[in-house]
Amino acid sequence: MTSWIELLDKQIEDQHMLKHEFYQRWSEGKLEKQQLQAYAKDYYLHIKAFPCYLSALHARCDDLQIRRQILENLMDEEAGNPNHIDLWRQFALSLGVSEEELANHEFSQAAQDMVATFRRLCDMPQLAVGLGALYTYEIQIPQVCVEKIRGLKEYFGVSARGYAYFTVHQEADIKHASEEKEMLQTLVGRENPDAVLQGSQEVLDTLWNFLSSFINSTEPCSCK
């Protein structure tokens, strides 16, 4: 019998971000620089909000060990020098986006919906739902970062400083996702795995819709 965690991993793999046309074009050097600039500006909303997702989970967690692990992830995001938000700004600037453009960017509805989805799931009474949302995202990031770095180096001439955000997350999110998986397996003994699976699917869909906003095709995922 297939376990709920195996179902979760299969669900994520079936709609992995690397299967999206936007990232496929990125890997093949078929994106226009303006598309990358638009992406860097719009995704900034999610980058800035990510520590808030973790804070919401940390504030409501009664399990001391799990709370410490969430705090470690939060510290990775907030306390580095440079921190992860600054690394993203560095990436945007390397693409020719100005500080003023980044600060004054009007975020798309797709970006706002994505952040709202993560915030709502991380505020759910069931802690496992929020952890499942972050796991769904972070388990994909190391592979995505490998392709992003390769594309940025080969096709766009971005320096190591420019893509440092992805270098950091290529390593860090292996650890974060592994810890989140362990936390999920601890919590789901007390909580409903169906709610975790549903929350994960909502994350997959909102990520897919966000990426679709940067290309002409807005068709739903047909990779299942």
Swiss-Prot record:
Disulfide bridge partners, by residue number: none
- Residues the entry annotates as binding Fe(2+) 1: E77, H84, H169
Task: List this protein's GO terms for biological process.
Answer: small molecule metabolic process; sulfur compound metabolic process
Return the cofactor note field.
Binds 2 divalent metal cations per subunit.
Residues the record lists as binding Fe(2+) 2:
E77, E138, D173, H176
Alphabetically sorted, this entry's keywords are: Iron, Metal-binding, Oxidoreductase
GO MF, one term, reads:
oxidoreductase activity
Where in the chain is the site Side-chain cleavage? Y23
State its cofactor: Fe(2+); Mn(2+)
Into which EC class is this enzyme placed? oxidoreductase
Give the EC number(s) under which this enzyme is classified: 1.3.3.-
InterPro entries, per this entry? Fol-rel_CADD (IPR027572), Haem_Oase-like_multi-hlx (IPR016084), PqqC-like (IPR039068), Thiaminase-2/PQQC (IPR004305)
- Give yes or no: UniProt keyword Metal-binding: yes
Instruction: Report which superkingdom the organism of origin falls in.
Output: Bacteria
- Report quaternary structure and partners: Homodimer.
Family under the similarity heading: Belongs to the CADD family.
Question: Which protein is depicted?
Answer: 4-aminobenzoate synthase
- Species source reads Chlamydia pneumoniae
Lineage here is: Bacteria, Pseudomonadati, Chlamydiota, Chlamydiia, Chlamydiales
